[in-house]
């Protein structure tokens, strides 16, 4: 099973991914945690470029770098592990590009979706958890952090990202909005319940 965690910066998605990973392992499942961009030697080098505060990256270049990292991750890591029966848990996947570059960068949701399909060889998560928080809360959570290039974009940018994610939720049955303002335990309880239902179906 392939599960992706999405959300604006500061949403707590990485925490929830780790909790689900620990839970599945406790049930005897084989689990692989991955992150985007990254997860491969090439992907980690691309990650360094994308998050470098000293670089001025054109929005189309930014998108193509994300797609290159994703394409490598799918072929080198995701496909082989799914074939071996692993639960693959992704800290961001294709919907991040749709929200950040397609929506917030105004490249266009349809354009990015088409390019995503090519980059991923039409691989899409079985479940997407979007951890939703207001942008004001996100900015509060990020204020004491050493911010990377994308995290420095500010609240207006994050608002565009969030709005695009919320639109995506209306288009897909396997895209679940989780209220990230609840306690960590309550958020995880909701995620665990959804995963267990999918495992039983």
Curated annotation (Swiss-Prot):
Keywords: ATP-binding, Kinase, Nucleotide biosynthesis, Nucleotide-binding, Transferase. It catalyses: dTMP + ATP = dTDP + ADP. ATP binds at residues 7-14. Its EC number is 2.7.4.9. The keyword Transferase applies. InterPro entries: P-loop_NTPase (IPR027417), Thymidylate_kin-like_dom (IPR039430), Thymidylate_kinase (IPR018094). It comes from the Bacteria. GO terms for cellular component: cytosol. GO terms for molecular function: ATP binding; dTMP kinase activity. One of its GO terms (biological process) is dUDP biosynthetic process. CDD domains: TMPK (cd01672). The keyword Kinase applies. Phosphorylation of dTMP to form dTDP in both de novo and salvage pathways of dTTP synthesis. Belongs to the thymidylate kinase family. HAMAP family: Thymidylate_kinase. This is Thymidylate kinase. It comes from Thermosipho africanus (strain TCF52B). The lineage of its organism: Bacteria, Thermotogati, Thermotogota, Thermotogae, Thermotogales.
């Amino acid at each position: 099973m392939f599960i992706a965690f999405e959300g604006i910066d500061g949403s707590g998605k990485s925490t929830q991914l780790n909790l689900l990973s620990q839970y599945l392992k406790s049930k005897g499942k084989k689990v692989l945690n991955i992150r985007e961009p990254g997860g491969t030697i090439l992907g980690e080098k691309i990650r360094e470029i994308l998050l470098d505060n000293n670089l001025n990256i054109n929005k189309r270049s930014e998108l193509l770098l994300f797609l290159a990292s994703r394409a490598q991750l799918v072929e080198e890591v995701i496909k082989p592990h799914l074939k071996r029966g692993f639960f693959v848990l992704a800290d961001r996947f294709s919907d991040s590009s749709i929200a950040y570059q397609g929506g917030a960068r105004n490249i266009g949701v349809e354009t990015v979706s088409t390019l995503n399909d090519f980059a991923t060889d039409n691989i899409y998560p079985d479940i997407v958890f979007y951890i939703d928080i207001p942008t004001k809360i996100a900015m509060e959570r990020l204020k004491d952090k050493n911010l990377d290039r994308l995290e420095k974009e500010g609240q207006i940018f994050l608002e565009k990202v969030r709005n695009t994610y919320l639109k995506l939720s209306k288009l897909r049955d396997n895209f679940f909005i989780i209220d990230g303002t609840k306690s960590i335990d309550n958020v995880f309880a909701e995620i665990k319940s959804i995963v267990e239902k999918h495992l039983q179906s």
